[in-house]
Amino acid sequence: MGLGLRGWGRPLLTVATALMLPVKPPAGSWGAQIIGGHEVTPHSRPYMASVRFGGQHHCGGFLLRARWVVSAAHCFSHRDLRTGLVVLGAHVLSTAEPTQQVFGIDALTTHPDYHPMTHANDICLLRLNGSAVLGPAVGLLRPPGRRARPPTAGTRCRVAGWGFVSDFEELPPGLMEAKVRVLDPDVCNSSWKGHLTLTMLCTRSGDSHRRGFCSADSGGPLVCRNRAHGLVSFSGLWCGDPKTPDVYTQVSAFVAWIWDVVRRSSPQPGPLPGTTRPPGEAA
């Protein structure tokens, strides 16, 4: 997902092109594939959600509570929610696995300050039309605490998704994941010509290899220290290119808003958020 003056380019535009051409990207193409990663052990990331439109995987997300999924706001631009589905408990999306649970989208809450042209505040909450049954293949992922700071430069994290695994639209065998490191925000902002905001977070591969995301991975979580610290938002033309670092929505900046939405929409009492470690979550 590249930046541009209108949509910040096609999801995968070069920095030069993205900052010069007012091209709006096709919906859902921002932040598309896991590049330089590996297939995870099936169902070892039970919090992962696949958002589908027209029977096709469109974006990722993570399960916050049994009826709530967190994703990226740009994934739902010009989309009819009545045709959307959320799949939990999946590893291979092309297979009807017995672990999968499929839900419709009951409601969408986009951050009120989301800006589609710059991807500022690129976050939303999906309320499912039913409650997920938690177990080994379907589990919760916690966001940072209300007073948590974003991870510092050099912190090791991971990002997963079902997007293409090459620049040539090669489909993955199952859920893929890449290990990345948090990049200094000033360095990242310089790479993006000063167009980033304080509520964005960047990563790099940490070595000489191209590693990261590109497009149908949008909305998926960046997991650092077993917390969802980022949401896939946008990148450059070439996946994992250090010249255009991967950019995420910084979840710690929106924790109060997240729980306020859940509380206002779920008046019934429930357990305090983040009191249970997600099943199958590895460090």
Swiss-Prot record:
Glycosylated sites: 129, 189
Single GO cellular component term: extracellular space
EC number: 3.4.21.-
SUPFAM superfamilies reported for this sequence: Trypsin-like serine proteases (SSF50494)
GO MF entry, a single one: heparin binding
Post-translation changes: After cleavage of the signal peptide, the N-terminus is probably further processed by CTSC. Processing by CTSC is probably required for accumulation in cytoplasmic granules; in the absence of CTSC the protein does not accumulate. N-glycosylated.
Tissue specificity comment: Detected in peripheral blood neutrophil granulocytes, but not in other types of leukocytes. Detected in neutrophils and neutrophil precursors in bone marrow (at protein level). Detected in myeloblasts and promyelocytes in bone marrow.
Localization per Swiss-Prot or TrEMBL: Cytoplasmic granule lumen; Secreted
One Pfam family from the record: Trypsin
Main location: cytoplasm
Domain Peptidase S1: 34-263
Coiled coil stretches, renumbered: none
Tagged with keyword Disulfide bond: yes
The keyword DNA-binding is annotated on this UniProt entry: no
Keywords of this entry: Disulfide bond, Glycoprotein, Heparin-binding, Hydrolase, Protease, Secreted, Serine protease, Signal
Active site as annotated: 74 (charge relay system), 122 (charge relay system), 218 (charge relay system)
Effect of substituting residue 235 to G: Decreases enzyme activity tenfold. Decreases enzyme activity twentyfold
Primary enzyme class: hydrolase
Regulation: Inhibited by SERPINA1, SERPINC1 and SERPING1.
InterPro entries: Peptidase_S1_PA, Peptidase_S1_PA_chymotrypsin, Peptidase_S1A, Trypsin_dom, TRYPSIN_HIS
Identification of the protein by name: Serine protease 57
Name of encoding gene: PRSS57
